[in-house]
Swiss-Prot record:
Reactions listed under catalytic activity: 2 D-alanine + ATP = D-alanyl-D-alanine + ADP + phosphate + H(+)
Keywords tagged on the record: ATP-binding, Cell shape, Cell wall biogenesis/degradation, Cytoplasm, Ligase, Magnesium, Manganese, Metal-binding, Nucleotide-binding, Peptidoglycan synthesis
Protein name listed in UniProt: D-alanine--D-alanine ligase
Domain ATP-grasp: 138-346
Binding site for ATP: 173-228
Binding site for Mg(2+) 1: D299, E313
Gene for this chain: ddl
């Protein structure tokens, strides 16, 4: 007797600045879940979270996927945020969040699934939350002895009055040198990041980031190669081959990251002997330090001259678009897209 397909509830969109990236990622994941043997294994029901945080069922979710961008809902709703699960959710056996940024990658949705006592793809509440907040993440990396570029952490409230603001600017200039990068602590995909080269740009960058997040980080800029490694599994983590992102822009900003032709990837990266192994090992150590399981993409900086390797960040729900490194790294490691999403769903039930 044939077993019935497992019903996957795929959640995408979300109340975050990476809403449209999530729509593109969801399209790729759904394609993988409906390809090859997966077409017999799984029944996929998409659920859409709009930019006000409201959940929508399969019919409207499919319309958003077809348009590849947010569209007007079929009827107006005055309330914002989550109120109840849409129709069709009662049949879901495994949840698959394809949400990037706050309110999706930060442990909030994972907590909902955990309260529902239903399996879900990806990291749990703790790993998701710590990985989302760059200051908490950096503290965990430091505790694990992983090398990082110098940085200064602060709160947006530190910029409140002129005296405190000047003190913050003086502190950053004393501990770092230009250029440096100002980042909101809880956004991804380079959203809200500024490269600053002087005090005026630093102040402007801090004000911009403070509008997006109450916690900020300023990192030392380094002239280094950008390397990435993918991680997969739950009880037994494994790392992929190492890839490199190359670009002609001044830095790897949102436009460069998501516009075709503005960046290229080299997989596997051409590295001196032993460097790839260091990246792969440190990627696993980073996941262990933050309690991350399921999947992750871990990013590094590498200096060709000094041979210094710095861990940059970890993404627990990495992009799954046609230009995203996570699926490409596994493809180069011998794991096709349909195999990859199958393994991710399997890991949810481990």
């Amino acid at each position: 007797m044939e077993s019935r397909p497992t019903t996957i509830g795929l959640v995408f969109g979300g109340y975050s600045g990476e809403h449209e990236v999530s729509i593109r990622s969801a399209t790729t994941v759904i394609h993988g879940l409906r390809s090859g043997e997966n077409s017999q294994r799984y029944r996929v029901i998409p659920f859409y979270i709009d930019q006000e945080g409201r959940w929508w069922g399969e019919a409207f979710a499919n319309r958003v996927l077809a348009s590849q961008k947010p569209i007007e809902p079929p009827h107006s709703i005055e309330t914002k945020g989550f109120r109840e699960l849409p129709e069709g959710s009662e049949t879901v056996q495994v949840w698959y969040p394809v949400l990037h940024g706050p309110n999706g990658e930060d442990g909030t949705v994972q907590g909902l699934f955990q309260l529902m006592r239903q399996p879900f793809v990806g990291a749990g509440v703790l790993g998701s939350a710590v990985s989302m907040d760059k200051l908490a993440m950096k503290a965990a990396f430091a505790g694990a002895g992983l090398s990082q570029v110098p940085y200064v952490g602060l709160n947006a409230s530190d910029l409140g009055d002129s005296a405190r603001r000047e003190h913050v600017l003086d502190r950053i200039e004393a501990e770092l040198h230009y250029p440096c990068f100002v980042k909101p602590a809880n956004l991804g995909s380079s959203v809200g990041i500024s490269k600053v080269r002087n005090r005026h740009e630093l102040e402007t960058g801090l004000d911009h980031a403070a509008q997006l997040d109450p916690r900020l980080v300023v990192e030392q800029g380094v002239d280094a190669r950008e390397l990435e490694c993918a991680v997969l599994g739950r009880h037994q983590l494994r790392s992929s081959v190492v890839g490199e992102v190359r670009f002609d822009a001044d830095w790897y900003d949102y436009t460069t990251k998501y516009t075709a032709g503005l960046s290229t990837t080299v997989i596997p990266a051409e590295l001196p002997e032993g460097v790839a192994e260091r990246v792969q090992q440190q990627a696993l150590e980073a996941c262990a330090a933050l309690g991350v399981v399921g999947m992750a993409r871990v990013d590094f900086f590498y200096d060709n001259t000094s041979h210094q390797l710095w861990i940059n960040e970890i993404n627990t729900l990495p992009g799954f678009t046609s230009q995203s490194m996570y699926p490409m790294l596994w493809e180069a490691s011998g794991v096709t897209l349909d195999q990859l999403v199958h393994k991710l769903v399997q890991s949810a039930g481990e």
